[in-house]
Amino acid sequence: MKFTLSWLKDHLETDASLDEIVERLTSIGLEVEHVDDKSSLKPFVIAKVLTAVQHPDADRLRVLTVDTGDGKSPVQVVCGAPNARAGLIGAFAAPGTYVPGIDVTLTVGKIRGVESHGMMCSERELELSDEHNGIIDLPADAPVGTSFASYAHLDDPVIEINLTPNRPDATSVYGIARDLAASGLGTLKSAAVEKIPGKGETPVKVVIEAPELCPGFALRLVRGVKNGPSPKWLQQRLIAIGLRPISALVDITNYVTFDRGRPLHVFDARKVAGNLVVRRAHDGEKVMALDGREYTLTPDMCAIADDNGVESIAGVMGGEHSGCDENTTDVLIESALWDPITTARTGRTLGIITDARYRFERGVDPEFMVPGVELATRLVLDLCGGEPAETEVVGYAGHKPKIVSFPISEVTRLTGIEVPKEESLDILSRLGFKPQGSSEVVDVALPSWRPDVDGKADLVEEVMRIHGVDNIAPQPLGAHDAVNSKILTTLQVRTRTAKRALAVRGMMEAVTWSFIPAKHAELFGGGQTALKLANPIAADMSDMRPSLLPGLIAAAQRNADKGIGDVALFEVSGTYEGDGADQQRRVAAGVRRGTAKLDGSGRSWAGNSGPVGVFDAKADAIAALEACGAPVERLQIEAGGPAWYHPGRSGTIKLGPKTVLGTFGEFHPKTMEGLDVSGPLCGFEVFVDAVPEPKAKPTKTKPKLELSAFQAVKRDFAFVVDKAVEAGTLVRAALAADKKLITAVSVFDIFEGASLGADKKSIAIEVSIQPVEKTLTDEDFEALAKRVVENVGKQTGGVLRG
């Protein structure tokens, strides 16, 4: 929300300085985000170039004589601007002036041997824009000798506040002035709006077919207007807050929107056919809006239509067909009340952001619907002339204020601050609330412009933000001599350790949205009605995510689109299987794209630049589970994963027959097509909350590290097994042959060929043997090897490859 200081003072009688106003705004909850104060431009004056001759020693410089309008002799200025010429009127900086755009304080100096007494400035040097190809060139009637900042209306600071969604009353300059006055920083000026008598009825009638979408509608015809440019003061205010002046009629509606928080719309009455009907839009109905784009409407949107069709998207944007232009002579002024939720949903679905939508979706003051028409009528008559008809009001039955029972003691109970009863009631009264009664519990009537206030806690908040939250005395946090229990829960510890484990593996942590498109949710097992948002922040963020993978895959693709195709990302966060509290899961997930392997990415002379695959994802998943405390040696890997993985290049990690701890693999081509991404791409998900809790054991000191004094030995074995035998089964069989001596088993080769026989394959393993009590003899190694072969043969049917 932007406004100028002079605009604020139209509604607030105050002698407070800009700094005091800014400080007070923030202290009462209207956080100031930025102040554009051009006070540094006060020393710059409008000056006229009398002569411009070539510099004697520089081809690109000119020597100017400049009249600064101070009644003294013209000054000499050396200038390099290509547009410097006799007769030009621009902005002049005298010696001693600080020029913000170049961060220099001017002095009298010589430029290539010629003295220069000041500077003719460009827009960039005054920080007005990036334009620096020439000095500022003002109109011929610009008053020489006067302040440039005053002439260009740069001496009126622009204040921007960052509004929270619960403050619709502060979407107007008047509402902000009301808050400042309530805080004691000035007096609020009268808000009375003159009632303009009309001549005859407004011939266009209004029919409301959807009262649930439009509880009130006011319409007024003004005949004989002249729609030209708006006056300079109005244009300057709109420009200051970032709006583009269009015409007097349109500028009036924009002005009232910001001045009083009342969005309006104007129709060219000659372009309206028949009466106006407020109804639900028909499915597939189209309208060309004022932004020049055609929009397709749906039945959950509200439209204003006539015999020609839709003339306006209610509460969001008007239609081009009935818009006002320079030929408009008869105008219909519309002021209506629109359902906030419908307005917000319509704007999000169509992708339209307007100042009207911003206010209607937060809630406007219903009691200012008719006064808004009167205010706009007065401005139209003053700026465009014309003759008004009577105002047509349909549907609005008046505002019935809500009454809240307010115990005065709530202020102390909720804040710990003793605010006198009289002060509390006085603050509420200054804010427009109406306390009734004098006991310790008073009934408070809520003002029509505060739909955000609902109960007694809200009233306490209103009292405290005006009384001053800085009056709450700081309290130190309680200190404990010792912590007798765990600070973090098991799930929190697992989340932290999983993040560390994945980061160590070269993956970067990402934080993605919990909301994803419905199409993506369905690809990953979601899409249930219970997981659809009632009020999504965007049309493509409609479902709670059933998996972390869609967000991570999309993030990896965005990196690839920007030239970073080899990327490894992970996230540890929540997923949703339903809307129950017990249906939210804690998941660690990750994706690798391109050649982003554990040992590096990109092309290399060492030849490690192959694409990522299923085993990269498997290793990541196992590492995450191990960090979470899962018994890795007991995990079972089953071929095949959920439908979003490639059926032949994916797997499921289980602990026992029923407990699924994770999935991993390369993604199915249809999944990648549905997400509109490219590969190579693999990923994994492990369910952190599914890892069983370790059994409670008496606390023991960690045993000392005992290292064997004997040399470790490695032996290789190659077994021929059926193709259906998994490598993991063979590895576990080899490990079980002697758990005391065998410390590790790893697969280093898999071979299939006709020489092995039909449906056979060879798996080669490396067995690490660590003697503990003595150096093993050849006979010991032979006996151990025999046990390995026997155990593998017993559990897998494998035989040593000859």
Curated annotation (Swiss-Prot):
Its cofactor is Mg(2+). Keywords: Aminoacyl-tRNA synthetase, ATP-binding, Cytoplasm, Ligase, Magnesium, Metal-binding, Nucleotide-binding, Protein biosynthesis, RNA-binding, tRNA-binding. InterPro entries: aa-tRNA-synth_II/BPL/LPL, B3/B4_tRNA-bd, DNA-bd_dom_put_sf, Fdx_antiC-bd, Fdx_antiC-bd_sf, NA-bd_OB-fold, Phe-tRNA-ligase_IIc_bsu, Phe-tRNA-ligase_IIc_bsu_bact. One of its GO terms (cellular component) is phenylalanine-tRNA ligase complex. The keyword Protein biosynthesis applies. Mg(2+) binds at D452, D458, E461, E462. Residues 399-474 form the B5 domain. PROSITE patterns: B5, FDX_ACB, TRBD. Binds 2 magnesium ions per tetramer. Belongs to the phenylalanyl-tRNA synthetase beta subunit family. Type 1 subfamily. Its EC number is 6.1.1.20. This is Phenylalanine--tRNA ligase beta subunit. It is an enzyme of class 6 (ligase). PANTHER family: PHENYLALANINE--TRNA LIGASE BETA SUBUNIT, PHENYLALANYL-TRNA SYNTHETASE BETA CHAIN AND LEUCINE-RICH REPEAT-CONTAINING PROTEIN 47. It catalyses: tRNA(Phe) + L-phenylalanine + ATP = L-phenylalanyl-tRNA(Phe) + AMP + diphosphate + H(+). It is found in: Cytoplasm. Tetramer of two alpha and two beta subunits. Residues 38-149 form the tRNA-binding domain. One of its GO terms (molecular function) is phenylalanine-tRNA ligase activity. Residues 708-801 form the FDX-ACB domain. Its main location: cytoplasm. CDD domains: PheRS_beta_core (cd00769), tRNA_bind_bactPheRS (cd02796).
